[in-house]
From Swiss-Prot:
<dbReference type="InterPro" id="IPR023803">
    <property type="entry name" value="Ribosomal_bS16_dom_sf"/>
</dbReference>
<dbReference type="Pfam" id="PF00886">
    <property type="entry name" value="Ribosomal_S16"/>
</dbReference>
<dbReference type="GO" id="GO:0006412">
    <property type="term" value="P:translation"/>
</dbReference>
<keyword id="KW-0687">Ribonucleoprotein</keyword>
<dbReference type="GO" id="GO:0015935">
    <property type="term" value="C:small ribosomal subunit"/>
</dbReference>
<dbReference type="InterPro" id="IPR000307">
    <property type="entry name" value="Ribosomal_bS16"/>
</dbReference>
<dbReference type="GO" id="GO:0003735">
    <property type="term" value="F:structural constituent of ribosome"/>
</dbReference>
<dbReference type="GO" id="GO:0005737">
    <property type="term" value="C:cytoplasm"/>
</dbReference>
<comment type="similarity">
    <text>Belongs to the bacterial ribosomal protein bS16 family.</text>
</comment>
<protein>
    <recommendedName>
        <fullName>Small ribosomal subunit protein bS16</fullName>
    </recommendedName>
</protein>
<keyword id="KW-0689">Ribosomal protein</keyword>
């Protein structure tokens, strides 16, 4: 099964997550099919905290990919921010 999930990068106590499309059998930080964004929970100042490629996420959802709980929450928040910004 294909999943859209977070892959952890960064150093100890400074997490940085890539949002990737991956086969569920692969390791969390292992091989992936496509990188569709990133999430930086410890961003400060003007650093970008979240970037998502919504078009590609929707494409993968239509193909049958399943989103992890955290990615679902991030996508929902990003869509809400886009609606209020317009």
């Amino acid at each position: 099964m294909v999943k859209i999930r977070l892959a952890r990068h960064g150093s100890k106590k400074r997490p940085f997550y890539q949002i990737v499309v991956s086969d569920s059998r692969n390791a969390r930080d292992g091989r992936f099919l496509e990188n569709v964004g990133f999430f930086n929970p410890v961003a400060s100042g003007k650093a970008e905290k979240l970037r998502l490629n919504i078009d590609r996420i929707e494409h993968w959802k239509n193909v049958g990919a399943e989103l992890s709980e955290r990615v679902q929450a991030l996508v929902k928040a990003e869509k809400k921010n886009l609606q209020t910004a317009s």
